[in-house]
From Swiss-Prot:
CDD domains: GrpE
Self-association and partners: Homodimer.
Identification of the protein by name: Protein GrpE
Gene that this polypeptide is encoded by: grpE
Pfam families: GrpE (PF01025)
Chain ranges passing through the membrane: none
């Protein structure tokens, strides 16, 4: 007695084999075509992967090129900054030395012109004589001092043209018969200037 299960399996295999044979007889190259299609698909996948890889490499190369350019520009800026900083430091040192030299020369020039005045004052104090002799010595010293100021281009501030707040300092306002208002009535302390620069304002009284 034949088992129905085995019979059914054999029947299925027979039918499947017959179908395969018919398919092959109708399309004898079907296996080759399937294989070619598979290879084409794989080839396409490889081409796609290669194109993507190529694009990534080009992008990476471009990025590296830009990075290198930026690095070079940064180094150039650093070098320029260092040069400017060094030049400024050298300029500052030269300027400081020049200022110091000018100040030293100016002090030396003033002292050279003032020391003879001190010498004459010391001589006047050392001489035994009358008050008149002392007065003459002081007058001579004053003239010498005025000459020294003139050599330094320092001049006395004038009060002849009336009160000027830029040049004079009013200590008091007074009434003075026969005088116009805003005139200098008396000078308490002389003022001096060098060019347009006021060294010391004149201390004065001013008329109403």
């Amino acid at each position: 007695m034949v088992d129905n299960k085995d019979f059914n399996e054999e029947l299925k295999e027979s039918i499947q084999e017959e179908l395969d044979n018919e398919t092959k007889s109708e399309n004898p190259n079907i296996d080759e075509e399937v294989e070619e299609v598979s290879e084409d698909i794989k080839a396409d996948e490889k081409v796609i992967d290669f194109e993507e890889l190529k694009a990534l490499k080009e992008e990476n190369t471009m990025f590296k090129s830009k990075t290198k350019k930026l690095e070079n520009e940064l180094e150039a800026l650093k070098d320029r900054l260092l040069r400017i900083s060094s030049e400024y430091e050298n300029y500052r040192k030269r300027t400081d030395k020049e200022k110091e030299r000018i100040y030293t020369d100016a002090c030396e020039d003033v002292l050279i012109k003032m020391l003879p005045v001190l010498d004459n004052l010391e001589r006047a104090l050392a001489v035994d004589g009358t008050v008149e002799d002392l007065k003459k010595g002081v007058e001579m010293t004053v003239r010498q001092f005025e000459d020294a100021l003139e050599k330094l281009q320092v001049e006395e501030i004038s009060t002849e043209n009336g009160f000027d707040p830029e040049l004079h300092q009013a200590m008091m306002v007074v009434e003075q018969e026969g005088s116009e208002p805003n005139q200098v009535a008396q000078v308490f302390q002389k003022g001096y200037k060098r060019g347009d620069k006021v060294i010391r304002h004149s201390m004065v009284t001013v008329t109403k």
